[in-house]
Amino acid sequence: MNIRPLHDRVIIKREEVETRSAGGIVLTGSAATKSTRAKVLAVGKGRILENGTVQPLDVKVGDIVIFNDGYGVKSEKIDGEEVLIISENDILAIVE
């Protein structure tokens, strides 16, 4: 992937969601919800603080994160893959 996010932006790829229920029923439409887990593909250099210093991000490439899938999440196709560009503020947790 040939893209570098700026500042506190993070590029993530959403994890695939199981499309079958525990009972084996295939889920479609609104029943098949999108995952809010994703793998971090790239990170910016950090948030620029009021005093001009750069605060590094807490997430790093390869982390699995849980994110807020709402306003401010930008979807793009890069190298044929759908990725999301989000602010680090939209990341709720790192899965360890």
Swiss-Prot record:
Principal location: cytoplasm
Keywords noted in UniProt: Chaperone, Cytoplasm, Stress response
Recorded GO CC terms: cytoplasm
Coiled coil is among the record's keywords: no
GO BP terms: chaperone cofactor-dependent protein refolding
Location(s) in or outside the cell: Cytoplasm
This protein's name: Co-chaperonin GroES
Protein's organism: Haemophilus influenzae (strain ATCC 51907 / DSM 11121 / KW20 / Rd)
